[in-house]
Amino acid sequence: MKYFGLDIESHDPLLTDQGPSWVYSQGEVLVTGIYDAQKQKKRALNGAGGDTVHDILFSSATTIVGANIGYDLGWLCYAHKLKIKDTRCGLIDVAIAESLIDEYQPFSLDALAQKYLRERKGSEDLAGIALQYGLKGDFRKHLKALWYGETPDKVSYKDEIRAYVISDADQPVRIWEKQHPILEEQGLMDAFIMNMKMVRITQAMKQHGVRIDYEKWQENCAIASAAYKDLHEDFVSKYGEVNINSPKQVAALFDKFEVPYKHKLVFKGWAPEGRKFSANDWLKGDEVWDQRKRLKESFPNIRVVKNKIVLMVPKQYAARTALQASSMGYQITNNPSVGKFAFAAVKATHQVAADIVEFKQVTNIITKFLGPNFGRFLVQDTVGDWRLHGNFDTVGARQTGRMSASKPNLQNIPSKTKLFEGTEKELDLAFMCREVFVADRGQMFVKLDFSGQENVLQAHFAVGAGGRLIRSMYMANPRLDEHQFVGERSGLIEQHGPKAGRKYAKSVRFGNAYGMQLQTMCEQFGWDKDFAEELTNAINDAAPWVRETMDAIQDMLLGKNAYRGKQRRYIKTIIGRRIHLREGNDRGAYKFYNYLIQGSASDMMKLALIKYAESDIANIVTLLLTVHDEGGFSVPITPQGFAAVLILQTFFCSAVELSIPINADPEVGHSWASAEGQHKTDGAFDETVQELLERVGHELLAGNAAKTTSTDDDEDEIDFDALGDEDDTEEEGEDE
């Protein structure tokens, strides 16, 4: 295997606002740096590197090494007019490797060069040149001007840029030589290989994009805008003009309507010379120190949150204090705390809070998805279709490694948000957002996700007698409704009814899984303390495996009666990814049960998508998007397409080997929103997946045919068998 360090420098004018400019056919690759590790030869090639880089990308005997390699791969394939999924070279990204070794450290090339090579990234010269011309901000934004001599004195700095790109190609190879043994020693290579395969998959998904029904989107934007206007007018008529994003204005409104809320005191200190300090300067473990004095001695509840020293105290607490004459003075800012938990705690009992929550949700959805902000990400392709080419980060979440989306963040589309619910003006904004995401022309949208994934993983990892119990229940019934089971076992369904009892069971169990304390549950779900205690005790007694497993994980991390003799400060997900408990952060150990579940869920999704991408069905079915535990695919309405979905379903069900079975249920339709699953009667499916695919496929084909045939409804009956013929469908696709 030949290793090539690789880096590009590009003119990327849209990167900050809209993502890589190649998506919008703007910008260019200025220079490509290559370091041949075998020959120890460095080169800077103009543009995208010509045949040299083309041959490297298409050789299975080569591996390219870089930092943020997916970005470079996208630009190079755009410049060479290549499909990313067709490239054959291996990929190594030292930033992704570092995310596995130490998820708390910065992953930039400069930080990695300092850590492993004891040197800096070679950017000082170019940064200085940019400043010399008064070019503000990151000098990389001005590389085009420096490359082409678009400076006041018309001087080109190509040699300096070539030296810079060569350095960026060379350093990752030398960093990888240090990282590779660490990954091997810690058993992280499987996780690393998985994530590197996902780089190619996510970049290919970005390159293809997802088709957007532009007319439907414009229609929904107009409807949402009119609804927002009505909502805003109604809000102003009740409460006046209020900036709902201003804590002070919301607090004033709460005071007017006597809505309770907390205040948060923020301590800000000054060193003797008047310099404002950072909390990190005086942070020892989880204690805050002022010079040699531990502040906890004076303020028992003081703690550090996001690098700010804070103390939760009653509203009437004094607004200023001092420690002693020889010590620094501390100014205490009495800030209202009116975040999402504050609203959750009072929205059930105070209409003003409920109205603000609704207004914020609607504003957020419309701003991000049903207005111009979303429209700026859309691109019209060569056949006139509008497409979205979003960004997908393979390891977006530092602790768990879960994928993330940006520009736009599709994870911000809620599952359900209804406006004017129960009235004739009712709108489902979540549905309106999703229904504009459609399959490729002449195809159907198939959504596939894991059924009860988090519940299954909790059962898989569960310890003790409770763990054996829940696993036996899943073995007896692979489609166990665990929330229903726990609701019945706890007596909540008998006490509160089937719907409310199941909902309470689900809320408490997920609250436990996400590490919520009792007070947080009260605020999140609008419960009083006694009711929350009653629910929590009932659920913990009925489902002891969650608490038992959480306790076992914390004991292992903290060395308290270490479970099965194990004592270590990290947990491992299914693939072997390590999630570390930092020194001095013992209080955060309660979160690691959730990290274990979320990280393993991420592993499952990635491994399922890798099975898909490495199979022949990737030539039939196209991955359009992935959000949380679901993937959206474009599938031909043909027997081949139907068969491919059945195979895809097996990939999801067999992504990892669990101690209990897991199911993945496809939903099929015209769009992301309209995708529907198998019909059920009395809890059992009354059609197979094959029947579902054929039924919905025929309905979609009939709908398409109706748009292009005579408007006389009674004239001709549609021949479903003819419409479903594979040859006819292929011809139709070629014509389009």
Q: What are the residue ranges of the model-derived segments?
A:
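Conserved "right-hand" nucleotidyltransferase catalytic core of DNA-directed polymerases
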Residues: M1-D17, S21-G33, Q40, L117, ...
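A short acidic-Thr-Gly-centered motif at the start of a beta-strand
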Residues: M1-K2, D55-F58, D428-M444, E614-I617
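Active-site-proximal helix-loop-helix substrate-binding element of RNase H-like nuclease domains
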Residues: Y24-H180, A279, P478, H483-S490, ...
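Short active-site loop/helix that positions an aromatic residue
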Residues: G70-L82, S99-I101, A251-E258, S451-G466
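Conserved catalytic core of nucleic-acid polymerases
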Residues: Q203, Q207, M328-I332, P336, ...
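Helix N-cap motif at beta-to-alpha junctions
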Residues: P636-F642
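Short amphipathic alpha-helices in soluble, non-transmembrane regions
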Residues: A644-F652
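Long, low-complexity, intrinsically disordered segments
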Residues: D714-E736
